[in-house]
Amino acid sequence: MTTTPELLAPAGDEECMIAAVNAGADAVYFGLRDGFNARARAANFATEELPRVFDYLHAHGVRGFVTFNTLVFDSELALAEKTLQAIARAGGDAIIVQDLGVAKLAHEVCPQLALHASTQMTVSSPEGARVAASLGVTRVVVPRELSVEEIARFSAGTDLELECFVHGALCMSWSGQCLTSEALEARSANRGQCAQSCRLPYDLYVDGGRRDLGDVKYLLSPKDLAAYALLPELLKAGICSFKLEGRMKGVEYVTNIVDKYRRALDHALNTNAKGLDANDEQELRLTFSRSFGPGFLKGSDHQTLVHGKYPGHRGLEVGRVERVEQSRGYVYVNAVPDAPALFPGDRVLFDQQRPEENEPRGSLFGVDDLGKGQLKLVFGGEEAGRRGSGADLDRVRVGDVVYKSRDIALARKLKRIAETERKLAIDVQVSGRVGELLQVTARDVLGRSAQTQSALPLAAATSRPLDRALITEKLCAFGESPFELRTLSVDLEGAVAISPSELKRMRRALTDALTEQQTPRAPREVTSARALSRFSVSEAASRPLLIPLLRTIEQVDRAIAMKDELGLVDIELDFMELVGLGVAVERVRAAGLKVIIATPRVQKPGEEGYDRRFRKLAPDGILARHLGAVEHFRHDGEGRLHGDFSLNATNARTALTLLDLGLTTLTPAYDLDATQLLALCEGVPASKLEVTVHQHLPLYHTEHCVYSHTLSKGKDFRTCGRPCEEHLIHLQDTQGLQHPVIVDVGCRNTVFNAKAQSAASVIGKLLNANVRRYRVELVRETTDETAHVLTAYRELIDGHIDARTAVKRASAIEKYGVTSGTLHVVTA
């Protein structure tokens, strides 16, 4: 357990790791090349390097955490176990994990290996933390969507350590709940392959018409988080680890953020330490920023979280282009007040309000201050004979905004910090009296200690006596050694004398003794996990169920009218804003059907009232979409609790873990393809699975409200005027697809895929595997469309039509047709 606040730094490669250590990190986190980490495109580390990596970190008093924060498939569990064993044996301090089954697996393999729940696990409340703790988790990385106040509530309700991101890129979607890359790019963010779809431009459509927003095009691209000023508040709220994002960034960026946040955290812990000033913030902006903000830590502000003008790095604004002399390599700029100074070697960028294109940028050969706020920037030019890394001036236009994007002097300073080896702090105690040997003890931050004594007894001083200043100068001047003095305790009786050369000899004896001591690896018991049973397919005893998941009262009425034709037993209700939910429950119950209510996708501290509202409606079951709901409802009685896709079960260990928590049925995660889904059916009783066979995949699930941002001036639900009650927004992507945006009871937005996805082609194999529950999800389909889709899948399940016919019939009502999705389904 962490006893003092920790600065946790990213390391995408070894150079960044060394830089983070030298810049002052208390711990670093990194991923492995074997996979299982959410930054698959980073250089990462080889598993066989782990002993050397941890030895290096521990020798510098730094902890090392391995990211294991992706979902794992059944075919990968053996490698996952082997990798976890290697991490434990190498001396890893913790793993950061997303997959619930992997957390349980790691705890079986090595109980002494600390488990940290990644933001990808979506542990957003104390109730969810209790589930995580039951699997062996000791720390939760809180979601970026929580405010300081909500974090304080979280902390008050759990004994687990809490870790918080304080700097870096923000995801638009709740971590672990983003399916955009999966749906649109066939690469899963839950597998470390995020396609950065939130950084793309989107057109806004309101009630079917395009709304012109000028240069605001990046509606889902948040500013970067910069919370250095909030560290004191976060400390009071209960945060023990302050996490910096950036495993995909380079060494300059890592050095800069660690150096700055080291000082900011030291200042938060001791106000006598120097904090950050305006120049420090400018330096943070120069290594990377999309503009800075507090994220959600100060609560929701939908007007400032996203500016929408650009998705990438800018830096510091210099001014606007007034004139270009291309052949001479000159660009004349009208500078803004307080424009940053420019020097040869600095890089600038020309913002042309088309960031999706390759914007002109380059390094400066020279800068002339012409006075009255006018600058002449000198680049390469044919006429001037300057060649090299100049900007592409033929694309620079009058009016372009000029940004300073890199500072060469800052780069040199950061290089020195990154390459200056970090020293270990040691505490020294000195004692002695006349006629006795001088005794010296030193202890470093790793707990290693060494003692030495003078060769001869101390004599009475006849000139300068031994004092604190002389001890500091001769005994504690550790110079080129890997140590530096932290505290000095002196206990001398009387005026004693010793030669400076003897003090130097004793210093060398101390440093040699400490250096020779190897940092011991804590003894650990590493075992193999118990094998899982394989489940045989038993003969089906009942007609497979079609389970409609409905979102409007009109859909409910139509489904009830067709209940006998469709063979309905259960209806799942996902009334996202809860409006009309009570009426729908009554109608389903009056029709003699069982009603299952879906919870919101996430629940934050202070939102427990939703669960009480659901319980008051007395449904036949709850469709739990977050771990807090699992904890809240799992003691309500057998048969009442169903787990949804958002619990992210992609392997048998995770599925069985969730079923052991009290779930009656479970919908597998949408990251599985057909082969993986069928493999899951072999490791879990297939009768316990509910498979979604038709849906509009929920791409993003966001705390940010597009309605509030674009259709109001309000910053949150209290001031936005609720435009979501009067309008329907679609976001049109670069392919021309218009994705509907639906608001839930927590004012969170779900962006649904414009295209429907079908699993029709695998239904036959699922039936053979004894899967009995088949869900069809609707979003805003009309009553006729509801009947059309439900009938097609009922007939397919009953064997009256084939998969191709079912898909063709489902496609008939879809504007963009039906896609195969990840299950490789046949299409019409």
Language model segments and positions:
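Surface-exposed amphipathic alpha-helical tracts and adjacent flexible/coil segments at the periphery
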Residues: M1-A23, A27-A40, V53-F54, H60-T70, ...
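Glycine-rich, highly charged phosphate/nucleotide-binding loops
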Residues: F45-P51
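Short glycine-biased active-site loop of nucleotidyltransferases that positions the nucleotide triphosphate
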Residues: H107
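Conserved phosphotransfer cores of two-component systems
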Residues: C110
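Active-site glycine-rich loop that binds ribose-phosphate moieties when present
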Residues: V123-S125, A226-A227
